[in-house]
């Protein structure tokens, strides 16, 4: 499976905790991430992660393009619902493209765990 990993700044620690918990599962899949999320994963795990631009610099749109062309099967996008994001239109577009292409997307830890436990 090809999995995209994205986290807002206030959720990066939560995503890293999730990734470390399931590193043995994720290691068998192809991973991509926005830049700072990918760097965090690379620095703290043994996982190989293809990194796109930072979300606000177009990374969300790059991952959206990968979804649209059939190159992503799952998205783990831990969003911070309590902080306004300057690139909110990009985030909305990414979530929309997931819906258009019927791509499972987890926007919180509980949903991410359910996806990993039941599908991966």
From Swiss-Prot:
Substrate binds at residues 8, 12, 54-55, 87. Its EC number is 4.2.3.3. GO terms for biological process: methylglyoxal biosynthetic process. GO terms for cellular component: cytosol. GO terms for molecular function: methylglyoxal synthase activity. The active site is at residue 60. Residues 1-120 form the MGS-like domain. Belongs to the methylglyoxal synthase family. NCBIfam families: MGSA, PRK05234.1. This is Methylglyoxal synthase.
